[in-house]
Swiss-Prot record:
The gene is pyrG. The lineage of its organism: Bacteria, Bacillati, Cyanobacteriota, Cyanophyceae, Synechococcales. Its EC number is 6.3.4.2. Residues 1-267 are annotated as: Amidoligase domain. Allosterically activated by GTP, when glutamine is the substrate; GTP has no effect on the reaction when ammonia is the substrate. The allosteric effector GTP functions by stabilizing the protein conformation that binds the tetrahedral intermediate(s) formed during glutamine hydrolysis. Inhibited by the product CTP, via allosteric rather than competitive inhibition. Pathway: Pyrimidine metabolism; CTP biosynthesis via de novo pathway; CTP from UDP: step 2/2. GO terms for molecular function: ATP binding; CTP synthase activity; glutaminase activity; identical protein binding; metal ion binding. CDD domains: CTPS_N, GATase1_CTP_Synthase. It holds the Pfam family GATase. This is CTP synthase.
Length: 546
């Protein structure tokens, strides 16, 4: 029978509930338990697909094409387990489902209310994860902060959930802040006490407290919080600030979090195998060299907008024993100044995805700089489209070449709308989304990096390379090294006369893992370090299914 864990947060937002949930998933998996992690987000958007990156950060795409919260990326990277649309629930999607049922007459004319109908739908979504994926443990992170009005239906639903499964099959974990007050010279537990009091007023008694702090808890504090918050002293867990999020599972293991959870859920205590994770963290913390990579993006004011990109670079750099130095450059700055001012001296350039015309000419300028100065370059999604625009304007001499997305009147639409997108009106959930196969050309750089003839990657786009320009593209020295299996859609392009120049229409950052760095990011880092790419060992990717 599946067990259930609920992770709530108190005192402040962005306290790290997602990392705690992902870390616990890793600790349970290291003991041989299968895990699925679910995120309940209290915003009314149906999904984050149409939200501004400045407000929400990255939209993480699952293998089955769901546009989800960036925390699902943490869940996948920490547990090596693919998530799906079942693992992402928002207030908007809950209300949409309930209203659709009401319109169909499913409630037989009854008055539809938050309790019981909304809370029942929330509980059903949690049960569905257990029923469809059959994990040993389902971990559910509740977004927001205890006390927020938006989170109340979710908190009420998880209170009711105890009645569904029984007390022995459920655990509540509350992540809270224990701040250091410089003027007093001590840490304060009062915010935690009040947060737990608020949670208990809703009817939820936490079993475990995970205390975020910037230093070790002072003597007697665990006992004090134990007494005031009605948890055992062993269940008061310290989660001290770490230099890397990948240290957190090891820290929580030392604190005994997994053992406490297994005791509460009456599951067998097993010996963890964290050897691989410890080796990865050791690599991360003990580099022998340095590599500097610049990310030229549209949303760099919020680095979380490119979270999976930066983490993928970190995975690849650590696997090469290198300390990654990231330089963030706003693409718009390159439109107004000399690219050399921003890009001189870097070892590699990444141009990631985005939407809309703003900053695109800056991305094109960065790619031209990489091409002219033989700097290793990797383009992702819009980054590939910008590479094609650079080719058209600056190599093929097609004046005014552009994407039809940015200039519908361009004389040379080298990037065009996918045929199936022609009549699409709605924005949310209507792009080419999720895992798609890609055929790799033999003898290409892509084939050397992947070591496969067919690969599967995740997509999120409406526009593609315009095949009317493919012959001219090939004649000018470029290579189409990856296509859809029917050869119609261009998925990867590269420039053979460059040390490392490759761009893809998909999002490889969504499948990179600490123990499985993505081949394209590994190749970029190796090239940036001056390594011989003929010696690249193809990196296996985790198997995925839809």
């Amino acid at each position: 029978m599946t067990k259930f864990i609920f992770v709530t947060g108190g005192v402040v937002s962005s306290i790290g509930k997602g990392i705690v949930a992902a870390s616990l998933g890793r600790l349970l998996k290291s003991r041989g338990y299968s895990v699925s992690i679910l995120k309940l987000d209290p915003y009314i958007n149906v999904d984050p697909g149409t939200m501004s990156p400045y407000q929400h950060g990255e939209v993480f795409v699952t293998a089955d094409g769901a546009e989800t919260d960036l925390d699902l990326g943490h869940y996948e990277r920490f547990t090596d387990t693919p998530m799906s649309r079942l693992n992402s629930v928002t207030t908007g999607s809950i209300y949409q489902a309930v209203i659709n049922k009401e319109r169909r007459g499913d409630y037989n004319g009854g008055t539809v209310q938050v309790i019981p109908h909304i809370t029942a739908e929330i509980r059903d979504r949690i049960h569905r994860v257990a029923q469809d994926t059959h994990p040993d443990v389902v971990i559910t992170e509740i977004g927001g902060t205890v006390g927020d009005i938006e989170s109340l239906p979710f908190l009420e639903a998880i209170r009711q959930f105890r009645k569904d499964v029984g007390r022995r099959d459920l655990a509540y974990i509350h992540v809270t802040l224990v701040p250091w007050i410089p003027s007093a010279g001590e840490m304060k537990t009062k915010p935690t006490q009040h947060s737990v009091k608020e949670l208990r007023s809703i009817g939820i008694q936490p079993d475990i407290l995970v205390c975020r702090c910037d230093r070790p808890l002072q003597a007697g504090m665990k006992e004090k919080m134990s007494e005031f918050c009605n948890v055992s002293p062993e269940a008061v867990i310290t989660s001290q600030d770490a230099s890397s999020i990948y240290e957190v599972p090891l820290m929580l293991e030392r604190e005994g979090l997994a053992e406490q959870v297994l005791d509460i859920l009456q599951l067998e205590q097993r010996q963890p195998d964290l050897t691989q994770w410890q080796r990865w963290v050791h690599q991360l913390q003990n580099p022998s060299r340095r590599v500097e990579v610049v990310i030229v993006g549209k949303y760099v004011r919020l680095n979380d907008a490119y979270l999976s990109v930066s983490e993928s670079l970190r995975h690849a750099a650590a696997s090469a024993d290198a300390d990654l130095q990231l330089r963030w450059v706003d693409a718009e700055d390159l439109e107004n100044g000399d690219p050399a001012t921003y890009l001189d001296g870097v070892d590699g350039i990444v141009v990631p995805g985005g939407f809309g015309a703003r900053g695109v000419d800056g991305k094109v300028a960065a790619i031209q700089f990489a091409r002219d100065h033989q700097i290793p370059f990797l383009g992702l999604c819009l980054g590939m489209q910008a590479a094609v625009i650079d080719w058209a304007r600056n190599v093929a001499g097609l004046d005014g070449a552009n994407s039809a997305e940015f200039d519908p009147e361009t004389p040379h639409p080298v990037i065009a709308l996918l045929p199936e997108q022609q009549d699409v009106v709605d924005l949310g959930g209507t792009m080419r989304l999720g895992l798609c196969p890609c055929k790799i050309q033999s003898g290409s750089l892509a084939q050397r990096l992947y070591g496969e003839d067919i690969i599967y990657e995740r997509h999120r786009h409406r526009y593609e390379f315009n095949n009317a320009y493919r012959s001219l593209f090939l004649e000018s020295g470029y290579c189409v090294s990856g296509t859809s299996p029917d050869s119609h859609l261009v998925e990867i392009v590269e420039r053979p006369d460059h040390p490392f120049f490759i761009a893809c229409q998909f999002h490889p950052e969504f499948v990179s893992r600490p123990n499985h760095p993505h081949p394209l990011f590994q190749g970029l880092i190796k090239a940036a370090l001056g390594s011989d790419l003929t010696l690249v060992d193809p990196a296996p990717l985790p198997a995925e299914t839809v």
